[in-house]
Design a protein with these regions (language model features):
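Peripheral, non-transmembrane regulatory/ligand-interaction domains of membrane transport proteins
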Residues: 1-207, 212-214, 220-223, 227-230, ...
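Hydrophobic alpha-helical transmembrane segments and their immediately adjacent juxtamembrane loops
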Residues: 43, 226-320
C-alpha cells in the first residue's frame, strides 16, 4: 500500500515501511525464515539474530559497526487494560536494531503502542533539516517517545484509581480497598521492574550514538531521557501516594478491628457474673434459698443486679 510517499508491505508477522531511503521493519514473533532474510539483507550479526529469537530478562545496548542493538522492557498497565488474570503478561520486550537508514523492531506479542504509532506515523517528523544520516535515529526517537507517552497515560490512570480509593477509604470502605490497593501495587511493581534500567541503557545509547550518528542525534536522545525522567517521577509520585494510602487504610482497618474486639471483650466481661451465678446455683450441693419458693426470683434478681452493676461499671470506665 502506498500513501504519503510511504511504501508499506505487510505479511503475517512482518510489516515493512519504506520512505525516502529509510526502512522500518516491525517483526512480531518472527519466523526463522523472516529473521534470516532480514539479517541477510541488513548484515545483522549472528549473535543478535540469536537474541532476537527469544526474550531477554534484562535491558541492554550493544554497538556494532553497522547498527546499534538495544533491548528495552515496557510495563503493561494491567489495571488500565483490565488484564488482571493469572498468567497474563506484565511486561513487554522490544528489541531495536538501529541502522543509519533502517530501524528493525522485534517483539513477541502485539504491542498497543507500536500499533498506535504506526497508524499515526507522520514521515514529516523524519525531516531533520535535510540530514539523511539521522533519519533512522529520529524514527527511533519518535517511537520511544510515543511508547513513553503511553506509559504516562497508564500512570495517570493509576493516579485516578488511587484518588478514587482515597475517597472510598474515608467512606468506610476500607475492606473493599484492600484488593484494589493490592492490584495497584502489582502494577506499580511491574512499572518499576521494567523501567529501572532504562536510564543506564539510554545513557549508554547516548554514548554509543556519538560514534554512530552525528552530534545532532545527541539532542534527540537527551529529549528521550528527559521523557523517561518524567515517567519515573510520575511512577515515584504514584508509589508514594500508594504507600501513604495503604498505611492509612491499614490504620483504619486496625482501629475498626480493635473496636470490634473491644466490644466482644466488654460483652464477655458484662456477662461473666451472670455465668458465674448460674454455674454456682447449678452445682450439685445444698445452696441457700434452694428450698425457698422464691429461689427462682432470687437468682433472677441477683443476675439482673449483676448485669446492671457491670453495665454501670462499663459506662463509668468508658468501655462502651
Amino acid at each position: 500500500m502506498v500513501g504519503n510517499d510511504i511504501l508499506i508491505i505487510t505479511s503475517l508477522m512482518l510489516t515493512r515501511r519504506d520512505y525516502k531511503g529509510l526502512t522500518w521493519i516491525d517483526l512480531e514473533s518472527p519466523t526463522e525464515q523472516e529473521l534470516t532474510a532480514t539479517a541477510t539483507e541488513y548484515k545483522i550479526h549472528p549473535l543478535v539474530v540469536g537474541e532476537l529469537t527469544q526474550s531477554s530478562q534484562r535491558s541492554k545496548v550493544d554497538l556494532y559497526s553497522e547498527f546499534i542493538y538495544l533491548i528495552l522492557h515496557f510495563p503493561i498497565c494491567q489495571i488500565y487494560y483490565g488484564q488482571q488474570a493469572e498468567g497474563s503478561p506484565d511486561t513487554e520486550e522490544i528489541d531495536f536494531v538501529i541502522g543509519r537508514d533502517f530501524l528493525i523492531t522485534t517483539h513477541y506479542q502485539p504491542i498497543v503502542g507500536i500499533g498506535e504509532f504506526a497508524a499515526s506515523f507522520n514521515p514529516n517528523h523524519l525531516e531533520d533539516r535535510g540530514k539523511d544520516k539521522t533519519q533512522a535515529g529520529l524514527l527511533f526517537y519518535h517511537l520511544v517517545r510515543h511508547l513513553y507517552g503511553g506509559l504516562a497515560t497508564g500512570l495517570d490512570y493509576i493516579n485516578g484509581v488511587l484518588k478514587q480509593a482515597e475517597r472510598k477509604v474515608f467512606a468506610n470502605q476500607e475492606r473493599a480497598m484492600v484488593t484494589l490497593l493490592a492490584e495497584v501495587n502489582r502494577n506499580l511493581l511491574d512499572f518499576r521492574w521494567a523501567l529501572k534500567h532504562h536510564r543506564e541503557v539510554l545513557d549508554s545509547l547516548q554514548s554509543a550514538s556519538r560514534e554512530f550518528f552525528d552530534d545532532g542525534f545527541h539532542h534527540y536522545l537527551g529529549a528521550v531521557i528527559s521523557e523517561y525522567n518524567r515517567i519515573w517521577a510520575m511512577l515515584e509520585n504514584n508509589r508514594e501516594t500508594f504507600v501513604d494510602l495503604r498505611e492509612t487504610n491499614e490504620s483504619l482497618l486496625s482501629i475498626k478491628t480493635n473496636e470490634t474486639m473491644k466490644v466482644f471483650t466488654v460483652v464477655a466481661v458484662i456477662f461473666f457474673p451472670l455465668t458465674l451465678v448460674t454455674q454456682f446455683w447449678g452445682m450439685n450441693m445444698t445452696l441457700p434459698f434452694a428450698d425457698s419458693p422464691y429461689s427462682y426470683y432470687f437468682v433472677l434478681a441477683l443476675m439482673l443486679a449483676s448485669l446492671f452493676s457491670m453495665l454501670v461499671l462499663a459506662k463509668y470506665r468508658r468501655w462502651l
